[in-house]
From Swiss-Prot:
Chain sites annotated for binding NAD(+): 154-155, 174, 205-206, 211, 232-234, 258
Cytoplasm listed as a keyword: no
Cysteine-cysteine disulfides: none
Record's protein name: D-lactate/D-glycerate dehydrogenase
Active site: 234, 263, 295
InterPro entries to which the protein is assigned, alphabetical: D-isomer_2_OHA_DH_cat_dom, D-isomer_DH_CS, D-isomer_DH_CS1, D-isomer_DH_NAD-bd, NAD(P)-bd_dom_sf
Function: Has both D-lactate and D-glycerate dehydrogenase activities. Equally active on pyruvate and hydroxypyruvate.
Quaternary structure and partners: Homodimer.
Length: 331
């Protein structure tokens, strides 16, 4: 058995080597992301492992089928950049890593919220320019807030577990309710109720056709003045121009974003001194009440180890058993 893994970073390599030593399976590590220029490297391999934000194009799976490869494993959760029709057409099974470290993402979302509540970006800016006064940048306390969690899967529940000890009131919305949270009476029946009651809204749902721009101008209009928005899920959940308008009006007091709807080509790139040709993104970056991280909420040592080794486990199982506990089946 031979596996080829694309987009392997230096920080992933030790965990890949550890897995190879333990499993006695050959794995070729390719540093470049998977695309049409390097798919031919997969010839003579039994499975492909990958992780990237840019789209996987249909021709890649045609090539895999041509090479006799029927096992494709992602080192991440999201499948929104994978063409399901191409997988079905080429009889390729796909797996993901549904939970590599929910706490990593939840912890950063809470960290960024605390920084916004206490005006940390504002103080950093002022002090860098010689202004050491605390006024007028008075902060807020999380124990006085109502946090609305949209999506109560692994990450959403981890976020709830962190918010509650701070003394925040937590309410939640999910189409699929968690029985334990329901017993606590945490759920509201509609998103509108959550928008109206919460002054912090945090997103922890996958990107689907039905939730594209779920936070749009109408949704922002239903929120309290001075609401804080956290998006550590998928960029397409937020209508960014509508968010900018809500920030301008004061409807939104601040936003912490680990994702952006047009992030491909912006995040995970060293731009140096070159300007980014995206006026909407540049507007976000110019605001001291907006904190942006480059889709890095997952990026902890435990998470990276899990992403690499669980993906390789999945790929091995797809090759050996034609199935994996983390196989994703499209309808």
């Amino acid at each position: 058995m031979k596996i080829i893994a694309y987009g392997i970073r230096d920080d992933e390599k030790p965990y890949l080597d550890e897995w190879v030593t333990k499993n006695h399976i050959e794995v070729k590590a390719v540093p470049d992301l998977l695309d049409s220029s390097n798919i031919d490297l997969a010839k003579d391999y039994d499975g492909v492992v990958a992780y990237q934000q840019k789209p996987y194009t249909a021709d890649l799976f045609d090539k895999m089928h041509e090479f006799g490869i029927h096992a494709f494993s992602l080192r991440n959760v999201g499948l929104d950049n994978v063409p399901a029709d191409a997988l079905k057409k080429n009889d390729i099974k796909i797996s993901n890593v549904p939970a590599y470290s929910p706490r990593a993402i939840a912890e950063l979302s809470v960290t960024q919220l605390l920084a916004l509540l206490r005006k940390i970006p504002e103080f950093e800016y002022k002090m860098a320019h010689g202004d050491y006064r605390w006024e007028p940048d008075i902060g807020l306390e999380l124990n006085q807030m109502t946090v609305g969690v949209i999506g109560t899967g692994r990450i959403g529940r981890a976020a709830i577990d962190i918010f509650k000890p701070f003394g925040a009131k937590v309410i939640a919305y999910d189409v699929f309710r968690n029985p334990a949270l329901e017993k606590e009476g945490m759920y509201v029946d509609t998103l509108e109720e959550l928008y109206q009651q919460a002054n912090v809204i945090t997103l922890h749902v996958p990107a689907l056709k039905d939730n594209y721009h779920m936070l749009d101008e109408k949704a922002f209009g239903q929120m309290q003045d001075g609401t804080f928005i956290l998006n550590f899920a998928r960029g397409t959940l937020v209508d960014t121009p509508a968010l900018l308008k809500a920030l301008d009006s004061g409807k939104v007091a601040g936003a912490a974003l680990d994702t952006y709807e047009n992030e491909v080509g912006i995040f995970d790139v060293d731009h140096g001194d070159q300007p980014i040709d995206d006026p909407v993104f540049n507007d976000l970056m110019s605001r001291r009440n907006v904190m942006i991280t480059p889709h890095a909420a997952f990026y902890t040592r435990p998470a990276v180890k899990n992403m690499v080794q669980i993906a390789l486990d999945n790929n091995r199982d797809l090759i050996e058993k034609n199935s994996s506990k983390n196989e994703v089946k499209f309808e």
